[in-house]
């Protein structure tokens, strides 16, 4: 069966999420980037929202952010396995993330973009300056 879902991440997804980060631009050396404990916090901490894109019993991408005291949420990651990039998975994750944020009364989404993620954030109507490494902001008012 070819079932696809975007859902909240669970404890069982932590290793798959961690392995997705084992690629550019997240990788700095030959080691698996980021401590597993940090990925655990993104999944288990109630201040965080982590969604996974699952298809054919495989996690192909995820998006994760953390609620800030200001009422906004900061996106830490939106990553899709290299072999599944440019197949609208990232866009679908962003749309579902925004929908979840609105249901949680989050007032804005903050994100940093570089290279391809910056282009996608532009298409999703985030605001930014024109610097190479760009900070994005999107208010979530109806």
Regions flagged by a language model, labelled:
Residues 114-132:
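Conserved active-site alpha-helix within GNAT-family acetyltransferase domains
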Residues 101-114:
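Conserved GNAT acetyl-CoA-binding A-motif
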Residues 80, 102, 126-127:
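Beta-rich extracellular carbohydrate-active architectures
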Residues 1-12, 142:
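Conserved N-terminal entry element of GNAT/NAT acetyltransferase domains
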Residues 78-85:
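A short, internal acetyl-CoA/4′-phosphopantetheine-binding micro-motif in the GNAT/acyltransferase core
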Residues 86-99:
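Conserved acetyl-CoA-binding loop-helix of GNAT-fold acetyltransferases
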Residues 11-12, 19-72, 76:
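Acetyl-CoA-dependent GNAT
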Residues 48, 130-135:
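Short hydrophobic/aromatic beta-strand or adjacent loop that forms the aromatic wall/cage
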